């Protein structure tokens, strides 16, 4: 508990001079190490708790400027939240955690479809693809008709209708 109070105090001192526009949240946890399952919360520069302890099963993001990534308690979804704790979208699960940011974008999910968001928490390409790989060099391989096949402990996507899109969601030729 002393660490939690100390952490809140430090967060207050560090961010005391910030304006609302530059406001951000700092993750505080009551344990020696931050690991999945350790209760944590987010506080603002005034020391006010914005996200209470235990609201989420795990908080991946240590400082929320625009976007925080957390795991819900009730069903284990990985979601993006803003600095007001508003849910923005569900994050695509990859390698037992949230999708990696590549080329400034990461994958999100809505109603079983995949789209893309940026590091600011803005949806750049609405979820509309059945399968979608990460962006690399400005393009991503996607499909509207694909199936998932098990390959050992991993899964692979198969499709006869792959195509490429740019960061605007426009279909392009592979370069």
Where are these regions (language model features)?
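Bacterial Sec-dependent N-terminal signal peptides
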Residues: 1-22
């Amino acid at each position: 508990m002393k660490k939690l109070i100390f952490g809140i105090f430090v967060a207050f001192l560090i961010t005391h001079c910030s304006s609302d526009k530059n406001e951000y949240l700092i993750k505080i946890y009551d344990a020696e190490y931050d690991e999945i399952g350790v209760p944590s919360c987010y506080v603002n520069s005034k020391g006010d708790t914005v996200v209470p302890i235990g609201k989420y099963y795990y908080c991946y993001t240590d400082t929320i400027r625009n976007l925080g990534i957390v795991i819900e308690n009730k069903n284990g979804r990985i979601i993006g939240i803003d600095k007001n704790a508003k849910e923005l979208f569900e994050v695509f699960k990859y390698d037992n955690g949230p999708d990696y940011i590549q080329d400034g974008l990461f994958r999100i999910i809505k109603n079983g479809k995949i789209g893309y968001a940026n590091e600011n928490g803005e949806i750049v390409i609405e979820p509309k693809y059945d399968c979608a790989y990460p962006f690399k060099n400005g393009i991503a391989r996607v499909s509207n008709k694909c199936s998932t096949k098990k390959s050992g402990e991993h899964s692979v996507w198969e499709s006869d209708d792959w195509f490429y899109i740019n960061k605007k969601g426009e279909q392009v030729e592979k370069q």
